[in-house]
């Protein structure tokens, strides 16, 4: 049994998921394909947060070197070792490049494990309309999944309370531990709202296309923006991190179509998946890559 990884969107959690071999079905859009589209959104949100924090390193970070006159030029660490004490950032100011390196298997405070490097190139100005940052990867793994491709983010508009950005991914690939891989191309628009200089929520819209690890060609479109809140309460318990609470995405392969609804604003890991009028509620904490839907795909094609 191969161990694979699913990043649960809410609460920044990762869970190990199994994929059974030989579990075939006549349907193209299996649980695996749907989960992998969710997984890629989650990975993108994680990488976006990491890149943003690496770009803002300054007075709120500590130097990885001893305190001397050259310390400010040395590798930097994230505040509170959020991404692990083995995560460092080196900046080449002359060429506008930052390199984020995770030595060995570097475990962050929320359990995410990273290794390898992310190379970030950026425009001379930052935080203004038209400014950009671009990410490439050098043997980079996020919780056992190898990430490849070119990720570019450009600011479309900005004001005192919000920022709108366009992120494109080209030649994207997610390679799982069993050697299977998913390819993707995407263009996503992210809107971030601020209150008192703190992020309160963001929305994500856009589309992507690719081939799943099962060899299924698919396209995915967010038809109702996915809303992420940064601090919310559920059954009296405070949930930290970026939590998806609303939004609908539609995944299509050939003449098959499945929609995924992220909810009505409640902070949980439940999603509703709909195909041909049949609805199934799934808990992202419990489902696994390679499993089949219990209800909506129980009828085989004739």
Q: PLM features: residue spans?
A:
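Repetitive helical segments and hydrophobic/amphipathic motifs
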Residues: 11-12
